[in-house]
UniProtKB/Swiss-Prot annotation:
Keyword Cytoplasm belongs to the record: no
Protein name: Probable Rubredoxin-1
Binding site for Fe cation: C24, C27, C57, C60
Alphabetized PROSITE patterns for the sequence: RUBREDOXIN_LIKE
The entry's keywords: Electron transport, Iron, Metal-binding, Transport
Gene Ontology biological process terms, A to Z: alkane catabolic process
Coiled coil: none
Cofactor(s) listed in the protein's UniProt record: Fe(3+)
InterPro entries: Rubredoxin-like_dom, Rubredoxin_dom, Rubredoxin_ET
Chain ranges of the Rubredoxin-like domain: 19-72
Co-factor note (free text): Binds 1 Fe(3+) ion per subunit.
UniProt record similarity statement: Belongs to the rubredoxin family.
Job of this protein: Rubredoxin is a small nonheme, iron protein lacking acid-labile sulfide. Its single Fe, chelated to 4 Cys, functions as an electron acceptor and may also stabilize the conformation of the molecule.
Amino acid sequence: MVELKIACKLDGSCEKPRYRKYKCKVCGWVYDPLKGDPSQNIPPKTPFEELPDTWICPVCRGKVGKESFEPLDEWVEFDE
């Protein structure tokens, strides 16, 4: 499940969906969904929640996976 944060105004218009950045608790590397992870063929605009279960931290390499990442209070928007 992808966690979205959407803000809507009283007139019914809404802002673009926003996606969280995640930080490795071991090395501090930050996954930015706007950039993806080219080292593992993860394209830009891939939310963290949609990364495959086999994805690993590109800095720690094989030592830690998604379970070692924590959500940050930093969000990015995807342009259509």
